[in-house]
From Swiss-Prot:
Cofactors demanded by this protein: Zn(2+)
Residues covered by the J domain: 5-70
GO molecular function, one term: heat shock protein binding
Name this protein carries in UniProt: Chaperone protein DnaJ
Residue stretches of each CXXCXGXG motif repeat: 146-153, 162-169, 184-191, 198-205
Highest taxon above the source species: Bacteria
CDD domains: DnaJ, DnaJ_C, DnaJ_zf
Cofactor-binding details, from the entry: Binds 2 Zn(2+) ions per monomer.
Taxonomic lineage from the root: Bacteria, Pseudomonadati, Pseudomonadota, Gammaproteobacteria, Legionellales
């Protein structure tokens, strides 16, 4: 039986962040966990399916391999989902937020660090910038570690061990026959308390600041693509690891080209005499202009493909084409003299209409047959 798409299993889109993937798995885990559905084989299968999808999509290397090669990429490179050792420690991270830290005792009762939040930044590019790549400087409002206390939150000293939980960050509670652990209400799971708060950050360990970052944009990037800057998100609380910054790309519309995959498309207007007699014209591309030969009797809607004048693919390196769509323009604002010449020309065409305008003649014949057959 073929495996379902991991994104479909979790109900997230291709650009879902790690936090969104984790949130989706939490929802499914609450619904299908075997402890909540004893004896339900279908729920057990769905839980395992969701757990497998979560394992891959929350691992940046496995996810990149899956995005490029599908299930085969994960199986061939990492020995399949589950080979990385998805254990109960991972489930403790997931279920700790669901069931009020009941599962946190499985991790040895240690205080859990509160990682910094991930940030998102929308970067707007021109088509030329997206196709050729560049480095762009961005400014991101964020939280950084306080420089005065180095993120500890304590003024001129180190935080003290919490007297309530003795530094574990957890309190063991007895509910009938069930013994569970909950986050310490005094230190909020840190295992430490601050007796003399830092005056610069008021004991928070963090300060707000606008960071200036240089982002390298690879050639071939497109709307919807994301660039992950590891560790450039918000600083974690009290020295915990920082989050990541996700740069979301949006490419502005271009007046001459629109992109479909690695191909570029462009409408090329020509007058009706060039369409009838043929000619040559300069065609703009993103790498300069090229000469395009218009053969005689070219019809509107005709497409000319200029090989290798499209976009170089972000991952494979293959180069797309520029596809020129011919639009035959009807002349407007004609003078009386010009109209007379066109009428004379039209009379000449009627003498051999089947040869000069075969599609028009065939259309009229079809219309005539349609009405006479009624």
């Amino acid at each position: 039986m073929a495996k379902r798409d991991y994104y479909e299993v979790l109900g997230v889109n291709l650009n879902a962040t790690e936090a969104e993937v984790k949130k989706a798995f939490r929802r499914l885990a609450m619904k299908y966990h075997p402890d909540r559905n004893p004896g339900d084989k279908d729920a057990e299968v769905k839980f395992k399916e969701a757990r497998e999808a979560y394992e891959v999509l929350c691992d940046s290397r496995k996810r990149a391999s899956y995005d490029q090669f599908g299930h085969a990429g994960v199986e061939q490179t990492f020995g399949g989902a589950g080979a990385g050792g998805f254990g109960f420690g991972d489930l403790g991270d997931i279920f700790g937020d669901i069931f009020g830290d009941i599962f946190s005792g499985a991790r040895g009762g240690q205080a859990r660090e509160q990682r910094g939040a991930d940030l998102a930044y929308e970067l707007v590019l021109s088509l030329e910038e997206a196709v050729h790549g560049l480095s762009r400087t961005i400014k991101v409002p964020t939280w950084i570690n306080c420089k005065t206390c180095n993120g500890s939150g304590a003024k001129g000293s180190s935080p003290a061990t919490c007297p309530r939980c003795n530094g574990s960050g957890q309190m063991r509670m007895q509910h009938g026959f069930l013994q569970v652990q909950q986050t310490c209400s005094v230190c909020r799971g840190r295992g430490q308390v601050i007796k003399d708060p830092c005056t610069d950050c008021h004991g928070q360990g963090r300060q707000q600041q606008t960071k200036t970052l240089s982002v390298k944009i690879p050639p071939g990037i497109d709307t919807g693509d994301r660039i992950r800057l590891a560790g450039e998100g918000e600083a974690g609380l009290f020295g915990a690891p920082p989050g990541d910054l996700y740069v979301q790309v949006r490419v502005k519309p271009h007046p001459l080209f629109h992109r479909e995959g690695n191909d570029l498309h462009s409408e090329v207007p020509i007058d009706f005499t060039t369409a009838a007699l043929g000619g040559e014209m300069e065609i703009p591309t993103l790498d300069g202009s090229v000469r395009l030969t218009i053969p005689p009797e070219t019809q509107g809607g005709k497409q000319f493909r200029l090989r290798g004048k499209g976009v170089k693919a972000l991952r494979s390196g293959a180069v797309g084409d520029l596809i020129c769509h011919i639009v035959v323009e009807t002349p407007v604002k004609l003078s009386p003299e010009q109209k007379d010449y066109l009428k004379q020309f039209a009379e000449l065409l009627k003498k051999d209409e089947k040869n000069h305008s075969p599609r028009t003649r065939n259309w009229f014949d079809s219309v005539k047959d349609f009405f006479t057959s009624k």
